[in-house]
Structures are given as C-alpha cells and as structure tokens.
C-alpha cells in the first residue's frame, strides 16, 4: 500500500458515515422533542453546538469520547446551576431508562449505543441579550453561572 492510498483510507475513517449521521440526527430530533414535551414553556430553545454543529465530530470508533453537545436554554434561570442539572437529569432518567445517565459538570450525559449526548442547562444573559443574542449563562465551578 502506498502512502497516498493509506492516507485516503485513514482519512475516510475520520468522517461520520451517512448511517451514523442519520442515527445522530434522529436522536437529536427525539431529544429536542422530548425536552419540549417534558419542560413545555420552561424552555426557550434547544441548540446543538460544538463539534457536531461544526461538522468536526469524530466517529466513536476513532474517538470514544465523541459527544453531541446540546444546550437547553431555560426561560428563567433564577436558581443555581445544580437545580437545572437536576431537572435535566430527571428528564434523562425518565426518557432514557435503559441508557447510562450521569452528571458530569457542567452537563448531564446520556450514553446511547451510538454516541453520548451532553445536555447543558443555560439561559440568556439578561441585559445583554438585545446586543449579543448568543450570550448565555452556563454552569461553572462552585455552582455559579458563567457568561459565555
């Protein structure tokens, strides 16, 4: 095998296959739908971010720690981050009884067969959101909110 052939074969393993992407997209759709049902008007938006949204996520066969990051934007975050992490964990345990669900600050992890999903509670930064629409509070250390 020459170097060019090896590199082509290797690089093809670094890209999600269509069926893997389809499984992930379906899971994202179901998670979003279930979040809307479970929380109703308590949440403002559900956003996929990170490597999957940038189309740089690696297949799990290459990177066992590959995950899909999902930000759950709550309408009002008047409590501490742990309050919202607990709510997301309760959601995950309710809908994903046969999956591994755990908290891993600042997220709640749902381990499905094909990939891990990390749910991050958040809320818009009040007072700035009219100027910077993509500014959010997310959990930080010491159970405090961080601006991003």
Model-found features: residue ranges?
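Aromatic/basic-lined ligand-recognition segments
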Residues: 130-148
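Short beta-strand-to-loop capping motifs
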Residues: 72-76
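Acidic Asp/Glu-based divalent-cation binding sites
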Residues: 69
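N-terminal regions immediately upstream of nucleotidyltransferase
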Residues: 1-65, 77-84, 108
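Conserved catalytic core of two-metal-ion nucleotidyltransferases
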Residues: 32-35, 85-135
């Amino acid at each position: 095998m020459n170097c060019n052939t090896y590199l082509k074969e290797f690089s093809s393993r670094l890209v999600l296959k269509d069926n893997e992407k389809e499984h992930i997209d379906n899971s994202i759709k179901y998670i979003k739908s279930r979040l809307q049902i479970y929380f109703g008007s308590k949440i403002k938006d559900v956003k996929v971010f990170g490597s999957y949204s940038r189309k740089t996520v690696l297949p799990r066969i290459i990177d066992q720690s590959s995950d899909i990051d999902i930000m759950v934007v709550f309408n009002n975050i008047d409590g501490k981050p742990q309050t919202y992490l607990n709510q997301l964990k309760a959601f995950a345990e309710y809908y994903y009884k046969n999956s591994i669900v755990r908290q891993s600050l600042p997220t709640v992890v749902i381990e499905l067969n094909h990939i891990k999903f990390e749910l991050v509670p958040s809320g818009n930064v009040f007072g700035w959101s009219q100027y910077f629409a993509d500014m959010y509070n997310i959990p930080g250390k010491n159970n405090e909110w961080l601006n991003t």
